Amino acid sequence: MATGDLKRSLRNLEQVLRLLNYPEEVDCVGLIKGDPAASLPIISYSFTSYSPYVTELIMESNVELIAKNDLRFIDAVYKLLRDQFNYKPILTKKQFIQCGFAEWKIQIVCDILNCVMKKHKELSSLQKIPSQQRKKISSGKSEPPLGNEKISAEAVGVDISGRFMTSGKKKAVVIRHLYNEDNVDISEDTLSPITDVNEAVDVSDLNATEIKMPEVKVPEIKAEQQDVNVNPEITALQTMLAECQENLKKLTSIEKRLDCLEQKMKGKVMVDENTWTNLLSRVTLLETEMLLSKKNDEFIEFNEVSEDYASCSDMDLLNPHRKSEVERPASIPLSSGYSTASSDSTPRASTVNYCGLNEISEETTIQKMERMKKMFEETAELLKCPNHYL
């Protein structure tokens, strides 16, 4: 950016600030750098302290420029420029808040100051029109005296509020004060005292005549009514915003809880209590069926083995001589008494042992069957009561 353009824009800004009667010092270094802190005080002074007409306009438009941070202040200024001054700045809000764009920022500040001064002139000219009408009304109401009769009357003066001020003089003197409604300094030239002695005014006639003041307070009353109508809407919106913020906080807390639960419940399965009890009961039934089937298979196998063993033992008992004849040539010759005793003793012992095993196995199977019956009865009782926890 050329330094000549910056210097030219700074000179233009100085001229506008002189017209604006800006009382504070200007941070030229900050303006050259494009620091928004150097230009924001000038803008706030132009809107809030320069002209009472402009401040009234801002109050009527329900835009607040006081007690705000830089971002909200820029938002309000841009809205005010768009709605009331029909001006759109070249830079955006973010660009204006950032450092840089020095020449454009100085140009925007100059444009804002020119818009404010122009609006001030327009509003002041509109306020002068009712004051001129008031002058015409007051001049038209002054009537000439009816005759040359000497009337002893007190000196009468009309003050700003329309009341009569009397003094102890004999001759009537009417003093008319021209004033400005917005507390503007009144010059001595505007005061036109009428001291014509020949024009005598009767006090009773002045009391009878009604001085019609223009209705200046009507827009103020309307503005107050609008504020009264708008205030409940604003309060309702504020309450709704507060409720929305609370609900958002609740939603965030609920989301956090859900995330924690998801992390905790990873790899876990949630099952209803009734379904879980049904599953457990079915599992127990299946286990009992498996045990019973195993026991039955073992019992069947045991019976088959015992039958095979019994058949073999019977065959040995029936043919002991054949076995001895077959075994004798291969074996060493022994005494006849010892060999017969040994051959006869083994099958008998085996038959005795086999009978004892059968009795033990029958007793164990009966006991196992009784235990299985008890298990079935217990499972049936458990299935009857569904609220029981296994």
Curated annotation (Swiss-Prot):
Keyword Phosphoprotein: yes
GO CC list: centriole; centrosome; ciliary basal body; cytosol; midbody; spindle pole
UniProt keyword terms in alphabetical order: Coiled coil, Cytoplasm, Cytoskeleton, Phosphoprotein
GO biological process, one term: centriole replication
Record-listed Phosphoserine modification sites: 331, 345
Function, as annotated: Centriole-enriched microtubule-binding protein involved in centriole biogenesis. In collaboration with CEP295 and POC1B, is required for the centriole-to-centrosome conversion by ensuring the formation of bona fide centriole wall. Functions as a linker component that maintains centrosome cohesion. Associates with CROCC and regulates its stability and localization to the centrosome.
The protein's name: Centrosomal protein of 44 kDa
Gene assigned in the entry: CEP44
